[in-house]
Amino acid sequence: MATLANDVQRPFELGTINEVPVIAGDIIYEGAVVGDNASGYARPLQAGDYFYGFAEARTDNVNGAAGDQKIRVRTQGAVELPIAGLAITNIGAAVYASDDDTFTLTATANTYIGRVARFVKSGVGVVTFNTLITAAA
């Protein structure tokens, strides 16, 4: 391909938002951790899923086929979460999710979602996340 000789209009997207098709017969709630069902469709995260991000709004695909609805997910940022066993000494610790609203410092079969950036109080911390980095982890 030759180098540009003129302006090109390119469709850019917001860097921290992605839209993903939703699995059939399910609802993903605002704030949920969203995972991949291994077929390319978003669902409420289950342990071991690929981490798509956090749901920006509720998406109801209960009566739809797979892909009829899309969900907007935040793919990077920082979020305050309840984390089982979190103490002030856990700054920098890896955080995992076992479902769409359960967070822990224990890896086992859970999904890595980010790292503790700030301790808020016992069992609550701010987690930084970036789905492109977690995908490579």
Tell what function each PLM region has.
Residues M1-A137:
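Surface-exposed, low-hydrophobicity beta-strand/loop segments enriched in small/polar/acidic residues
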